[in-house]
Amino acid sequence: MKGLVIKTTGSSYIVRMNDGSDAECHVKGNFRIRGIRSTNPVAVGDFVTVEDGWIMDVEDRRNYIIRKSTNLSKESHILAANIDQVALIVTVNHPVTSTTFIDRFLATCEAYRVRAILIFNKIDLLTDEELAQLADLRALYESIGYETLALSALDLNSATSNSEASNAEGSNARSAINSLFAGKVTLLSGNSGVGKSTLLNALFGRELTRTGKISDAHDKGMHTTTFSEMYFLEEKNERTKDEGNLSPFTFHPSALIDTPGIKGFGTIDFEREEVSHFFPEIFRASQECRFSNCTHTNEPGCAVQQKIITGDIAISRYESYLSILDDTTEGKYRA
């Protein structure tokens, strides 16, 4: 029988079967997916075949988002599979989300051809100086082509603006975010403490996941979500007896996948010559470089270096590019 993995708990998986029922399933110790080495051979969003409570097969994935499990680790971890977009939740402060983390995540989305949206949360806590920093960050990423949204998950009814959704009079954060998520499977990710769980609870109007406080000592987030889980936003149709073998998405066209907060983001299997392809503005500039194999580090006639001097490419983005380039030679990453 076929179904959709909607929750992982480490040792087991909850599968929404095509008849609408949920089943707790397991995988055998030697279960692996060909060509992918990861700590979790099955991920939320996978379509699977189940027999007697065992996951026997995983259908070919349309896409997935993967990262290195921990610093200096050779293991990888799949955050989610078969998604339409990623909503990366970031904060200018409380805690600070580094541009290195943002850029590494965005580069991975580019590599796996997954649309990425930046949602800046906790804007109600920002000082005037931090609000100016927020405006600069939004301008930077929107100039590259990424959609951004700024809000407070504690007050989704407050006025807001985003780069593509309607900014008509009366528009608020709730309507803007509902527009972004409608009809799509969206992965929510970000550092610990940025408010993913708070946002999820606010969208559903009830406590789906526990929220936590920020550590006073280091202003770092503390994990509250411990496992990945998919939540369906709305019902489209009522299931009838004759529709017992249809995908859950037939009845729930919009879904959010909540994932545990992560500290750093290590890229997987990036070839050195491909890294620039995952930074759109660097890739565009590279077409004017003197050498086709330019790494944009110290070669003469490098158009990327010239764009940095003129301010057309942000130094923070270039530094993130260099850090990933370093991954390809040393096999490590820094958050």
What are these regions (language model features)?
Residues 22-40:
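Beta-strand/loop nucleic-acid-binding surfaces
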Residues 1-10:
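Structural detector for short beta-strands of small beta-barrel domains
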Residues 83-90, 113-123, 145-150:
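Conserved beta-strand/loop subsegment of P-loop NTPase cores
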Residues 192, 197, 202:
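Walker A/P-loop
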Residues 11, 37-53, 58-85, 115-116, ...:
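Helix-rich effector regions associated with P-loop NTPase G domains
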Residues 125-194:
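Canonical P-loop GTPase G-domain recognition
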Residues 100-115:
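Histidine-anchored nucleotide/phosphate-binding helix
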Residues 3, 79-101:
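Glycine- and charge-enriched low-complexity intrinsically disordered segments
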